[in-house]
Amino acid sequence: MTTIKTSNLGFPRLGRKREWKKAIENYWAHKIDKAELDQTLTDLHKENLLLQKNYHLDSIPVGDFSLYDHILDTSLLFNIIPERFQGREVNDDLLFDIARGNKEHVASALIKWFNTNYHYIVPEWDNVEPKVEKNTLLERFKYAQSINVNAHPVIVGPITFVKLSKGGHQSFEEKVETLLPLYKEVLQSLVDAGAEYIQIDEPILVTDDSESYEDITRKAYDYFANEGLGKYLVIQTYFERVHLKFLSSLPVGGLGLDLVHDNGYNLKQIEDGDFDQSKALYAGIIDGRNVWAADIEAKKQLIETLQQHTQQLVIQPSSSLLHVPVSLDDETLDESIAEGLSFATEKLDELDALRRLFNDNDLSKYEHYKARYERFQSQSFKNLEYDFESVPTHRKSPFAKRKQLQNQRLNLPDLPTTTIGSFPQTREVRKFRADWKNNRITDAEYQEFLQNEIARWIKIQEDIGLDVLVHGEFERNDMVEFFGEKLQGFLVTKFGWVQSYGSRAVKPPVIYGDVKWTAPLTVKETVYAQSLTDKPVKGMLTGPVTILNWSFERVDVPRKVVQDQIALAIDEEVLALEEAGIKVIQVDEPALREGLPLRSEYHEQYLEDAVHSFKLATSSVHDETQIHTHMCYSQFGQIIHAIHDLDADVISIETSRSHGDLIQDFEDINYDLGIGLGVYDIHSPRIPTEEEITTAINRSLQQIDRSLFWVNPDCGLKTRKENEVKDALTVLVNAVKKKRQESESTTA
């Protein structure tokens, strides 16, 4: 058999303990200057490269490291600058302003990266002049060479980049053709600098409509081949299957395929002879998106199968390791569960174990991982019985009747205002929580602090004039991790951070066993907040679909079973809140859209399961109890009917970063439930104007019945500063008051 090689597609940017995040946020807060930021990030990039080198990879990616987002990096590389930000020097400060907005201009749209919890900044083509502005990819490649790292450059391919863009008068094909000479310039510079191959990521080729743009895809890669570059290119795909016969016909040196999340189709196509054996096969055999250790014996057998179909085999993760934490080294976990886990560095070590086995006949690492996996699998985490049938999955009455009863009970004004749930997690809040978790303060001291913060923010909300209040979620570090800490069947790590967007990091819990509610989770804080005001306070919960999508899910039982187990746990908490007198309960599902499979053949079942789980969690309450939900960052056209089927009394949806595009989705559906379309972007420090909020309200009311419409920010306010929150909410409430006055004067 031929020698196998190992490679990687991308590595986590955050650092073991979020050094990347802290440096960038310190720069934004003017606590460090640009020179210190650059040095910190250079050191971290070097650490990442050398860490990967320790695992004997034949080639290490460079270009995956970023100050914010690799798609935004590509936009700046080719001078695809939003019109409102043009005329400035292309530098890191411009990058941050495009991503976050500033006092003068709104940020660019933020969209989920395929069906992951990562988000990219959408490129904007309106009135742009594409050119190679600053070849940072070449700089990073040369840096890797300078520290003796055998690296391959990584760049998002032209088909994917343009397909993920918006705006401009050119057609999709015209935009691709515009970029081809610029890609050629960058690719040639990398080859001239010594790149043995270039990883060109085209994940868009795994989607349903990829066959509709095969002609322009072929034209693009024929162009590169005619320029003498084809043999240096490896087209990487991930997250799903591809049309392998077409992909194999492209004049490139290699193809990267996901052999984990392809439902077996990529392997079948290889076995059917659709892979061009003159090319290198970059086989994604180690799961790049989940944290479970590989069944290394099964991977050995897979490699043996693949070797029958290629003479150039490179094994790698199924996708960039951006989606998993850095390392288990700093964790102190129950060994019986830790043996079943694998973070980024452990995944690279699994690749090294397989490389040693096949190339050197060295069984030591292989046997180690095989024994660990077998010990973990010998345990049983399926111990509980569930009565799914006894819990209702439909509300007692139709929405019209519920709305009448809720109006009588809540007595809310026209265009009611609220927020999405969380308020600023200040340094003081985080310190008190950390001190409590580390037993540096007593339970009583921590509860006193929480109650003081809740009381302070209840008063702030009342002073501003909001109609439905929230307690602020100061006891929660994350909307999923919090529930993972309290529900049976979850494991929460200390340093298992992954990047969500920009400097925002989340720590997904690990679901390892049966999920069960054992005690109230949120009742104490919510009831205390309600005791301070006559206005309704929302109970704040995270929904079953989001908890599952934002956790590392177990793989030993079907996904639907885990989702419904979580739904039953949330149902218990919903009933506990209702019994405690809470009149409005929000069950957030911001991740419902992101979990939608990339292939439409799987959509119907996914959405059916998601709707069922949400209704399982929310249908036991009385008609008078108002159920809210919230979704964000998404393109909802494909799921608008499922959103309606949730039968939530009120749904709030992020629209600000889409600049109103979402409202068009309501033109084709008679949406007859309560709805709030977020009227300003909380991900930017910029304070909206009354005029902007009024414009957003007016546009929304063109499509939505006024009696159903709510006014709110687009997401929780956890990441904002206190003064930003107060100022923005004051503007929001003032704009609504003027709208109410207009209505009163019109009807007078």
UniProtKB/Swiss-Prot annotation:
It holds the Pfam family Meth_synt_2. The active site is at H683. Belongs to the vitamin-B12 independent methionine synthase family. 5-methyltetrahydropteroyltri-L-glutamate binds at R18, E19, W20, K21, K112, W550, E594. GO terms for biological process: methionine biosynthetic process; methylation. Zn(2+) binds at H630, C632, E654, C715. This is 5-methyltetrahydropteroyltriglutamate--homocysteine methyltransferase. The keyword Zinc applies. Binds 1 zinc ion per subunit. The keyword Lyase does not apply. L-methionine binds at I420, G421, S422, E473, D588. Its cofactor is Zn(2+). Its EC number is 2.1.1.14. Catalyzes the transfer of a methyl group from 5-methyltetrahydrofolate to homocysteine resulting in methionine formation. InterPro entries: Cbl-indep_Met_Synth_N (IPR013215), Cobalamin-indep_Met_synthase (IPR006276), Met_Synth_C/arc (IPR002629), UROD/MetE-like_sf (IPR038071). GO terms for molecular function: 5-methyltetrahydropteroyltriglutamate-homocysteine S-methyltransferase activity; zinc ion binding. It comes from Staphylococcus epidermidis (strain ATCC 12228 / FDA PCI 1200). It is an enzyme of class 2 (transferase). L-homocysteine binds at I420, G421, S422, E473, D588.
